[in-house]
Every structure is written in C-alpha cells, then in structure tokens.
Amino acid sequence: NYNAQGQMEENTNKSYIFDVVNNSWTQIAPPNNGEGYWGKLGAPPFVALPDGRVMLSYFGDFGRSSYNESMIYDPVSNMWTLTGTNKQGRTTEAGYTLLSNDKVLTVNTDRGVSSAEIFDPATGRWSPAGNTPQVLANSEIGPALTLPSGKVLAEGATGANALYDPATNSWSAAPNFPKLGNGLQLEAPDNYSVILPSGNVLTSTGTFICSTQNCTIMGPSPFFEYDWKANAWIRVIDDLLIPSSSAKGADYVMLSLPTGQVMIAYKDKIEFYSSSGIPDRTWLPIVDSISSENISPATTYQISGKQLSGLTQGTHFGDEHENATNYPIVQIENIKTHHVSYARSFDFSSTSIQPNVSSTFNFIVNPKIENGPSLLREVEEQRLCPRY
C-alpha cells in the first residue's frame, strides 16, 4: 500500500509503503526526489493503475498555470518516473478515475472550464475527453466513479453532475443535486461516493460557500443514492448516529466492505449502511481454477479467473483521500459453524476493471482458521462468486 503525506498546511512530500504482513511503514524517496515542484505534495490526485503502479500528480496552486507534471511509482523497482507532461488542464483539487479500458479520466478543475482529459498509461500521454454539459469544478470537485455499465458518474462541486461514456468519448447530463429549503444548492465538494451491490452509488453531499477570500465546505450533508437505471437521485433517510444536519460531507470516510455494506466513519463515530438490491449476474467474478481444493493454513494457493477485481474502483473521493477496492478477496465459511474468515490475497497479476479480463492472484489462509469442510468464495466489489 502506498501513502503520500502532504496537505498544504504541512508542506511535506513524505511518502511511505505499508507492509501488511509486518504491519509497518517504510519511508521511500519522494516523487522526483523532492526536486522542482515536488518539495511538497499538497492534496494530490492519484490512482492505482491495473499493473500495480501508482500515478500521482502535482497539486499546484490556482494562481500558477505550469503545474502539469505527474509521476508514476513502481513498487517493484521502488522508483519514480516522470509522465503525462502534455496535460492541458491543472491538476489542482482534481480526481483520477480508472476506466474499464485501463485508462484514467480526469475532469479539469480550472475555474469556469468544463474540459476533461484521458491519460493512457501505455503511452504516458494525455488526450482530450470532451466537455461536461455543465461546469463541475468550483475550486473543488466531487468524486467520479466508473459504474458496472462502464460509464462514469462524475459529481460536481457546483451541484451539477455528468455521465461519461468511454465507448463514444462523450458526456451527457446527470440530474443535479436538489436544493435545500433555504435555497442553497447541495453539491459534492471533496465528498465520498461508494458503489453498492445493486450498481447504485451512495454519496454524501454538502454546501460550498465561497467569498472573495476563500471557500468553505459546510453542512448539512444529506446522503443520496444514485439510481443508475432511472438516472435519478434518491434521498437516503437521515441517521440519528451521524445526523446530516450537523455533519460536513468532506469529513466522512466511506469504505465498501465484502459483506455488501458500506462502513461510514465520522469523527469518533462509525456506522454501517445496508442497501437493497442485488448485482447483475454478469458482474460476478468467474473462478476458472484454484491450485488446490484442500486448503491448509499458512500455505499459499493461486486462483485464476475473469473479472476477479470487479468492474469499478468501488470508492472515490475526488482527490487526496482514495481507498479503491478493485482487488480480489477470499472469503471462507465453515459449513458447520458458519463462521466466516478472510484469507490474505496478494500478487495480483492485474487489478483491471475491464469486463471478462483474465487474471490470477495468490492467497494464504490464517493459521487460526477453524478446521473442517468450508465454502470458499472470491469477493470483488461486494459481489460474491458462486461457491467453490
């Protein structure tokens, strides 16, 4: 796992790798060894590429127009490489979305601009991706998630939203967020969105109040589900534990879980959101083979199949707080006790979200697992494969 530290007020460019086996962090060299613009990272856009590398762009300032550099970190070589220097729009407060063709989409955050661009990891170059029907950025921008259909739902910090179709490289309008009773427009500035098992999207909202000096994200922050079939927003009932009337959407942290639920953390509170609906069978992972059907603790096994990493990144924030979950997980249920445990999965050949793409990964079972006949399932993006 890669982590880059450096909010604007911290003025750092520290970067770390997390070792899940030893539960420890190791500091690595910063992008470009900290030279040039990379003396601090700010709140940079970044994305995990399907081959395991991480792409990170310079945060910059709205007052400067020359910040178009990106770096790619290769965990195998432990090295950074300059890329994407032909980008036209600023990367300030932008977000990067992995597409179903393994490319990366971003909506530019220059004020008053509606343009978008696509990065091709194979060439290291950006190309135009059309214009959104309405401006989505307002010094901040909302999350943009690839849906199981392959289209991208891009949410705006202006109240406007849009859908991108990679097949046609074109945009269409999605419904705006509603207004509050006092007339303030609900928006998604620095807000999380999560794909639900049904393919709908859970998102938090807020208001974005700007003066001549600065902009402030404020509550209330009601939750909505985007119904991808109806192309409509549905208000989610308020919760007493984390009341939307006193919360700021930018302070939520949301994570999709292999149970199909969404974990929502806000300050010192944690709760779980359960939705209705089931996934389409064509979204399910397909397990072609497993290296052994007799599973023993502390032994490595390999699974091969298709769509093992799902058809979406799972979660998106907009810029600096990404926690994508497009990687496979192994769930083991003891038939007698129905106790569930999870193996540690690793060495993913690919985390591509292309439909029907083939891949492999390894897993190792916890030494403390219960003995006895068990059901093994592969989980991706809250969707279980048939029992194996």
Question: Language-model segments: which ranges?
Answer:
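Trp- and S/T/G-rich repeat-edge/linker motifs of beta-rich repeat architectures
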Residues: 19-35, 72-86, 123-134, 168-183, ...
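Beta-propeller and closely related beta-sheet repeat lectin domains
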Residues: 42-46, 93-96, 141-144, 189-193, ...
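Blade-level signature of beta-propeller repeat domains, shared across WD40, Kelch, NHL, RCC1
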Residues: 247-284
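Immunoglobulin-like IPT/TIG beta-sandwich domains and homologous Ig-like subdomains
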Residues: 1, 30, 39-42, 126-131, ...
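Short glycine/acidic-enriched loop and turn motifs that connect beta-strands
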Residues: 4-9, 60-65, 110-113, 159, ...
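Beta-propeller blade signature
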Residues: 13-21, 68-75, 115-121, 161-166, ...
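A detector of repeated loop/turn-to-beta-strand junctions in beta-rich toroidal repeat architectures
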Residues: 12, 43, 65-67, 91-93, ...
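Entry beta-strands of beta-propeller and related beta-repeat scaffolds
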Residues: 1, 5-9, 51-57, 101-107, ...
